[in-house]
Amino acid sequence: MNLHALCLLLLLLGSSTKAGEIIGGTECIPHSRPYMAYLEIVTSDNYLSACSGFLIRRNFVLTAAHCAGRSITVLLGAHNKTYKEDTWQKLEVEKQFIHPNYDKRLVLHDIMLLKLKEKAKLTLGVGTLPLSANFNFIPPGRMCRAVGWGRTNVNEPASDTLQEVKMRLQEPQSCKHFTSFQHKSQLCVGNPKKMQNVYKGDSGGPLLCAGIAQGIASYVHPNAKPPAVFTRISHYRPWINKILREN
């Protein structure tokens, strides 16, 4: 198995592993990230899996292509995904739009839009997240935040609450050990000297820079050491806009 496939498996949350927190991060203030979506996935092999995602329109969620499955249920308005609140909205996915150039082996073009069967109701607990503008090429050096329901560490016990962590955009050379990394369509994120990273279960979650979604969590090294690779949203705005316009 190549390095990229192994890394992808470690970001995707399988049925045999409990979800936990982002590594080196902190628990979000409840409902301070109202656009966050927890994805309950039935895979093509009928296993249960999970990813993160985020609401960009009342009827569309953006996530990673490797989070695709036989069926997906989206949970909105959650902080602790095991503790039901009045803010919760559970919506079924009507259609999964995987990027036509998605390469599972190389983990390229790892982006997917989910059209919901019903429109979400916008409330204090459920809202949408703005996306990076077309071809807004955010440079290395910016400090951003990753958000998701991933694990705290490779062997840490699980937590079910939404987490966030500060991560700095790196120069592309920092991701040269990922042989298929493409700077034009991906972001290299996280200081290699700090153990702050996304991990298993964070796939599909956003990278937020000044309140704008700039990236989508894709993969990381199996030992969870930074940097991580995120899909660069600005590169895909024409495709995103086309799907939203036609559906």
UniProtKB/Swiss-Prot annotation:
Primary site of residence: secreted
EC numbers on record: 3.4.21.39
SUPFAM superfamilies, A to Z: Trypsin-like serine proteases
Record has rRNA-binding as a keyword: no
Annotated InterPro entries: Peptidase_S1_PA, Peptidase_S1_PA_chymotrypsin, Peptidase_S1A, Trypsin_dom, TRYPSIN_HIS, TRYPSIN_SER
Record-annotated membrane-spanning stretches: none
Top-level taxon of origin: Eukaryota
Chain's gene name: Cma1
Protein name, entry field: Chymase
GO cellular component: cytoplasmic ribonucleoprotein granule; cytosol; extracellular region; extracellular space; secretory granule
Family per record: Belongs to the peptidase S1 family. Granzyme subfamily.
Function: Major secreted protease of mast cells with suspected roles in vasoactive peptide generation, extracellular matrix degradation, and regulation of gland secretion.
Keyword Nucleus tagged: no
GO terms of molecular function: endopeptidase activity; peptidase activity; peptide binding; serine-type endopeptidase activity; serine-type peptidase activity
Catalytic activity, as annotated: Preferential cleavage: Phe-|-Xaa > Tyr-|-Xaa > Trp-|-Xaa > Leu-|-Xaa
Glycosylation sites (chain numbering): N80
Class of this enzyme: hydrolase
Any Gene Ontology biological process: cellular response to glucose stimulus
UniProt-annotated location(s): Secreted; Cytoplasmic granule
Chain residues in the propeptide: 20-21
Catalytic residues (UniProt): H66 (charge relay system), D110 (charge relay system), S203 (charge relay system)
Tissue: Mast cells.
Keywords: Disulfide bond, Glycoprotein, Hydrolase, Protease, Secreted, Serine protease, Signal, Zymogen
Disulfide bonds: C51-C67, C144-C209, C175-C188
UniProt domain Peptidase S1: residue ranges: 22-245
Signal sequence range: 1-19
